[in-house]
C-alpha cells in the first residue's frame, strides 16, 4: 500500500480543507407575497406555487 513519505503540515491540511465550505441556498422572491422562498417549492408564507394556491395557510 502507498504510504506518505512525509507528514503533511498544518498549513497544507488547512489549505486543502478550505475548499470544504458550504454554499448558501439559492432564494427567490414569491410573486404573491414578496417573501423569500426556496426555488421550485411552495411558499411557506402564502401557500402559492406557480401563481396557484396549493396549500391553505392559516
Curated annotation (Swiss-Prot):
GO terms for biological process: translation. Signal peptide: none annotated. InterPro entries: Ribosomal_bL32, Ribosomal_bL32_bact, Ribosomal_zn-bd. The keyword NAD does not apply. Keywords: Ribonucleoprotein, Ribosomal protein. GO terms for cellular component: large ribosomal subunit. The keyword Glycoprotein does not apply. GO terms for molecular function: structural constituent of ribosome. NCBIfam families: rpmF_bact. Belongs to the bacterial ribosomal protein bL32 family. PANTHER family: 50S RIBOSOMAL PROTEIN L32 (PTHR35534), LARGE RIBOSOMAL SUBUNIT PROTEIN BL32 (PTHR35534:SF1). This is Large ribosomal subunit protein bL32. The lineage of its organism: Bacteria, Pseudomonadati, Aquificota, Aquificia, Aquificales. The gene is rpmF.
Amino acid at each position: 500500500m502507498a504510504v506518505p513519505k512525509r507528514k503533511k503540515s498544518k498549513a497544507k491540511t488547512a489549505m486543502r480543507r478550505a475548499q470544504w465550505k458550504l454554499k448558501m441556498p439559492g432564494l427567490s422572491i414569491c410573486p404573491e407575497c414578496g417573501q423569500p422562498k426556496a426555488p421550485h417549492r411552495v411558499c411557506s408564507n402564502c401557500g402559492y406555487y406557480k401563481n396557484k394556491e396549493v396549500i391553505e395557510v392559516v
